[in-house]
């Protein structure tokens, strides 16, 4: 799958789940489950409830995503 196939959306962290998973509410109101990308995990980026994040979704499964950026 090419990198350009991903859909990027803004969202807010609603809840922290086990195994670095998060429940994220997107701007359009949908709620998805997202995990942290490898570079964020490697650099110990902390994500807390209420943080604004950028989530990448694949066209194949719009209920799961990957957190790629945390806004300050």
Swiss-Prot record:
Localization of this protein: Cytoplasm
S1-like domain ranges (all copies): 1-72
A single GO cellular-component term on record: cytosol
This protein's UniProt keywords: Cytoplasm, Initiation factor, Protein biosynthesis, RNA-binding, rRNA-binding
Keyword RNA-binding: yes
SUPFAM superfamilies according to UniProt: Nucleic acid-binding proteins
SMART domains reported for this sequence: S1 (SM00316)
The keyword Protein biosynthesis belongs to this UniProt entry's keyword annotation: yes
GO MF entry, a single one: ribosome binding
Oligomeric form and interacting partners: Component of the 30S ribosomal translation pre-initiation complex which assembles on the 30S ribosome in the order IF-2 and IF-3, IF-1 and N-formylmethionyl-tRNA(fMet); mRNA recruitment can occur at any time during PIC assembly.
Record-stated family: Belongs to the IF-1 family.
Function in brief: One of the essential components for the initiation of protein synthesis. Stabilizes the binding of IF-2 and IF-3 on the 30S subunit to which N-formylmethionyl-tRNA(fMet) subsequently binds. Helps modulate mRNA selection, yielding the 30S pre-initiation complex (PIC). Upon addition of the 50S ribosomal subunit IF-1, IF-2 and IF-3 are released leaving the mature 70S translation initiation complex.
Protein name per its UniProtKB record: Translation initiation factor IF-1
Native source species: Shewanella frigidimarina (strain NCIMB 400)
Organismal lineage: Bacteria, Pseudomonadati, Pseudomonadota, Gammaproteobacteria, Alteromonadales
